[in-house]
UniProtKB/Swiss-Prot annotation:
It comes from the Eukaryota. Alpha-conotoxins act on postsynaptic membranes, they bind to the nicotinic acetylcholine receptors (nAChR) and thus inhibit them. Belongs to the conotoxin M superfamily. This is Alpha-conotoxin-like Sm3.2. Disulfide bonds join C1-C13, C2-C11, C8-C14. GO terms for cellular component: extracellular region. Keywords: Disulfide bond, Secreted. It comes from Conus stercusmuscarum (Fly-specked cone). It is found in: Secreted. The cysteine framework is III (CC-C-C-CC). Expressed by the venom duct. Signal peptide: none annotated.
Length: 15
C-alpha cells in the first residue's frame, strides 16, 4: 500500500 486515501478505495497508489 502506498498511501491511504479516501478518494482511492482504502489503500491504493494514487498519483
Amino acid at each position: 500500500c502506498c498511501i491511504a486515501r479516501q478518494i482511492c478505495e482504502g489503500c491504493i497508489c494514487c498519483i
